[in-house]
Amino acid sequence: MQRRILLAGSAAGLFAPAVLRAQERTVSIYSARHYDSDKQIHEAFTQASGIRIRIIEAGADQLIERIRAEGANSPADIFLTVDASRLARAMEAGITQPYASAVIDSRIPEGLREPGGHWFAASRRARVLMYDKAKGAPAGLVRYEDLANDRYKGQITVRSSGNGYNVALASSFLAANGAEATEAWARGIAANLARPPAGGDRDQIRAMMAGQGAIAVSNTYYLGLMSISQQIEERELAQRVGVIFPNQGDRGTHVNISGAALVKTSPHPAEARAFLEFLTTPAAQRIFALGNMEFPAATEAETHPFLLALGDFRQESPDGQKLLANAPEALRLMQRAGWR
C-alpha cells in the first residue's frame, strides 16, 4: 500500500480524471541494458501507473550520440545503462539534467547518487576474487593489490585488459594508487596469468574450477547467474566457488552499477520521474535482485539468498567522473604492462 501512495504522490496530476487517457501517457527509455528482468520492471510500472513504456535498445555510447544528435526533438526521457563512467559520459555530453527526489534520496545511499542529482544507481555488481572452496582461499589474498604478488604466478584467470569491467577496475585502482603503481600492478597480473585472457567472466570461473589457476576475477552477477542456471552442472559448480571481497580494510570492493538519468530534453518529465522513483521501490529492486542476480541499490531491499550468503561487504563509492577520466590512461597502462 505504501508503495502505491509514494508512486501516486511522485506523479502528481498524472492520475487526475481529466487526463486519464492511458494511451497518451508514455515514457521513452533509451536503454543499454538488455535483460528479461528489465521487461518485468517495465510491465510492473505500467500496471501500477498506466504509463506505457517505449524502449530503444543499443550500446551506451550509441545511445548517448543518438540523443545528442536528436537534440531538442529527442523522444528520449530516460537514459539507462551499466557502468558509472557511461553515466558520467552522458552527463559530460550535456544530455542529462539534475532532478531532486526526496523518495530516491531516502532509498538510495548517498554514495550511489551523483552529487549534482544527474543520476543514481539502481543495482550493483561487485568485482571480486573467486576460488575453489575445496582448495581453500589462497593465502594472503586480501586486496586487489595482492594479485600482482609473484606468489600467485600461474594462478590468475581474468578477462582481457580491454574488457569494460577491467578498465573500470583499473581506473579505480589508478585513482587510488597512481600511474606508476597501476602499471606495476598490471605487469604483475600479466606475469601471474594461468592462461592468456579468453572469454567472459563465467569462462574465468569455469577455467579456475577446472584446475587452470586458483584465482578467478569476476563480477558476482555472473556467479549468481550460474547458481540459477538451467544446467545442473553450472548450479553445482557455483556452490563450490568461494568469494573474497577485496580491500575491506581500506577503500572497499569495486562495484559496477546500473543507473538511470533524466534526459535534459525529456518531453515527458513527470512520467519519467515517476519511473525513476519506481526503480527504487521494493517491487522493482526485488526484480533486479531475484530476476537478474544483482545486488539491489536501495537500502533494506531484498537480496537473493545466494548473494546474501556471500556475506556483507564494504563497497567503494562509484565516482563516474574519475572512472571516465582515468579510463584511457588505465587501458594504456594495462596494455603497456603486457596485460592483453
Language model segments and positions:
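N-terminal export signals
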Residues: 5-22
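Periplasmic solute-binding protein
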Residues: 87-95, 114-142, 170-174, 255-261
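Short helix-loop capping/hinge motifs at secondary-structure junctions, enriched
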Residues: 135-142, 174-182, 266-272
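Early extracytoplasmic/lumenal segment of secretory-pathway proteins
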Residues: 22-88
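Extracellular/periplasmic bilobal clamshell ligand-binding domains
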Residues: 305-340
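Mature extracytoplasmic/periplasmic domains
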Residues: 258-318
